[in-house]
Amino acid sequence: MGTPLDYGHKNYNHYGAYLKNKYDGQRVYKIIADAGFTCPNRDGSKGYGGCTYCNVDSFTPELSRKLPTIREQIEQGMERAYKNYRAEKFIIYFQPNTNTYAPTHYLKMLYDEGLSVNTDNIVGLSVGTRPDCIDFEKLALLESYTDRFDVDLEMGMESIYDETLLKINRGCSHQEFLNAIRLAENTKVDICVHTIFGFPWETHDMMLKYADEINQFPQIKFVKLHHLHIVKGSIMGAKYSRDPFKLFTIDEYTDFIAEFISYLRPDIVLQRLFGLADYDLLIAPNWGMKKSQIQSYIDKRLEAAGIIQGSNYKPELMDTLSK
């Protein structure tokens, strides 16, 4: 197992440092590709309306019809990344909506198009999806790319509690998440898990238990940790406007994240420590900081507190839970 300082001089495994280490110091940048997918929780397959925290406007068919081709998006994204960040290598990131929600042959066509734009400089494929849109055939497709690219599958766990998943209209149970994780167990596809902290009915101790769940699965290589934020155009946003509820302050969230990562397995790489909505959509919480300022604030607090990722992780507990 790696140590927290394997990837950067931080108190946790930092994704940017991980990429630099893996790709010999080269600057690696994710290029987002929007393939115009929808979501089974919106089109009636699993439900309507989507998750209550989602902005409904981001799922309109009109937006999808106006999209440039995958090739055009990636070429433009690479050009911007090189110009603005001097990026040298790229990961093609199918991010918006549910990017395995289609027949496998159609997915192959899209992924192939994305990975063929500039094969000399593309090093990875990242695909965001829901746990209920994964099966053996789709995992086999993703694994077929691992001889040429690093491949990770990003899935929204959001919460480990079915009560929460029901309240937020997730349309997906925690058991479905566990089933998808287990499907990937013996593949070469890395798993990235997305979580949301701060649902008002979940207690501090309930949220800490997310770490125990994540730690059980060695195929989980990456995590994205988000705090709950309320955005315009969401069902939760309308409810919050009528009856505001408690959300994390930045100090409360930093204190919680510090404790959480101390229980997190020390080899896991943290791709993100917090979420950040566009300011024109954000209702709350508004911490009054830019993304880089929030990142710096959290890093400094973690360092000052002497928090180390995995310092409270107990492998023997995982052995008990997995039996």
What are these regions (language model features)?
Residues M1-T52, V56-I91:
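N-terminal [4Fe-4S]-dependent radical SAM core
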Residues G2-K20, D24-Y29, H229-K323:
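Auxiliary Fe-S-binding modules of radical SAM enzymes
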Residues Y29-A33, F90-I92, L125-V127, V151-M155, ...:
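Hydrophobic faces of well-ordered beta-strands that scaffold small-molecule active sites
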Residues D57-G77, A81-T104, V117-I134, D150-F177, ...:
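Core AdoMet radical
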Residues G77-K83, I134-R148, N179, L208-Q219, ...:
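Short amphipathic alpha-helices and their capping/turn segments at secondary-structure boundaries
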Residues A81-Y85, Y111-D120, A140-D150, R182-N186, ...:
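Acidic (Asp/Glu)-rich catalytic clusters
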Residues K108-S116, E143, T203-K221, I250-D251, ...:
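Short, electropositive alpha-helical surface patch
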Residues Q175-I235, D251-F274:
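Conserved C-terminal portion of the radical SAM core fold
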